[in-house]
Amino acid sequence: MSTIAESARIHPMAVVEDGATIGEGVKIGPFCHVGPHVVLHANVELLSHAIVTGRTVIGKGTRIFPMAVVGGDPQSVHHGGEETTLTVGANCTIREGVTMNTGTADFGGQTIVGDNNLFLANSHVAHDCRVGNHVIMSNNVMLAGHVVIEDRVILGGGSAVHQFTRVGRQAFVGGLSAVSYDVIPYGMLNGNPGLLSGLNVVGMTRAGVDRAVIHRVRRAYKSIFEGPGSVRENAAAIREEYADCEQAVHILDFIAADSDRALSSPTRGQKG
């Protein structure tokens, strides 16, 4: 039996299957479909024709627009019908035609989306992705399986991110870019194949990062990608010099971390 809060408003032409949990203040419009294992927290709004299915939890205040399908089975040949999940955080906006899939059993079974994210029309979050907070995915952005998107990343329209790739905090990916390799935090990537084109200085400035700090991060960037060794060797060599710079340390930690993908760089042949 479903658990439906008294203050929830469900249109008579919507379908809420037995077993769903509907929180206070939830609004479900006409022709929506809510599956039996779905949890909608307080003040979630489903506009007409939105579908939430699978073992999916939607955080408070999130709005889902027409024709979005949230919680569908993973688009993976390895999926055998296992009970996997999707969790979407609070205050997200999921626009028309967006698709988000649950995880796959072989990789923990979870797709996780954070808070305050904006997913524009027809963007796609595949199985086992991890999306942080305050992320903007523009129209037609495609995340393949197992992608990690850190906080405050902006992905331009039509960009595509290869499976298992990481995009670091506050990076900016230009429209129609092909992201085949990890993108460092605060980096800017453009093109197909995607190449780094410097730092997201505008984004850092808007976030209140001091100009002197931005200058230091630029120096670190130059040392990493223009130094005598490999990218990882260069990053390790400057760690002590930049130990007091939060942004630089985050870049260095990102480079040092284990990853299934190489690092994007300013030149096609250099991959860290």
Swiss-Prot record:
**Entry EC number(s):** 2.3.1.129
Subunit annotation: Homotrimer.
- Quote the catalytic activity from the record: a (3R)-hydroxyacyl-[ACP] + UDP-N-acetyl-alpha-D-glucosamine = a UDP-3-O-[(3R)-3-hydroxyacyl]-N-acetyl-alpha-D-glucosamine + holo-[ACP]
Q: Which CDD domains match?
A: LbH_UDP-GlcNAc_AT (cd03351)
- Function recorded in the entry: Involved in the biosynthesis of lipid A, a phosphorylated glycolipid that anchors the lipopolysaccharide to the outer membrane of the cell.
Q: Which GO terms describe its biological process?
A: lipid A biosynthetic process
Main subcellular location of this protein, as a coarse class: cytoplasm
Main EC class of this protein?
A: transferase
User: Sorted alphabetically, which SUPFAM superfamilies does this protein's record hold?
Assistant: Trimeric LpxA-like enzymes
Do you know which Pfam families this protein is assigned to?
Answer: Acetyltransf_11, Hexapep
GO cellular component terms, semicolon-separated: cytoplasm; membrane
Where found, per UniProt?
A: Cytoplasm
- Spell out the PANTHER family in the cross-references: ACYL-[ACYL-CARRIER-PROTEIN]--UDP-N-ACETYLGLUCOSAMINE O-ACYLTRANSFERASE (PTHR43480), ACYL-[ACYL-CARRIER-PROTEIN]--UDP-N-ACETYLGLUCOSAMINE O-ACYLTRANSFERASE, MITOCHONDRIAL-RELATED (PTHR43480:SF1)
Pathway field of the UniProt record reads:
Glycolipid biosynthesis; lipid IV(A) biosynthesis; lipid IV(A) from (3R)-3-hydroxytetradecanoyl-[acyl-carrier-protein] and UDP-N-acetyl-alpha-D-glucosamine: step 1/6
Q: What is this protein called?
A: Acyl-[acyl-carrier-protein]--UDP-N-acetylglucosamine O-acyltransferase
Q: Which UniProt keywords apply?
A: Acyltransferase, Cytoplasm, Lipid A biosynthesis, Lipid biosynthesis, Lipid metabolism, Repeat, Transferase
- A molecular-function term among this protein's GO annotations: acyl-[acyl-carrier-protein]-UDP-N-acetylglucosamine O-acyltransferase activity
Q: Family membership, please give it.
A: Belongs to the transferase hexapeptide repeat family. LpxA subfamily.
GN (gene name): lpxA
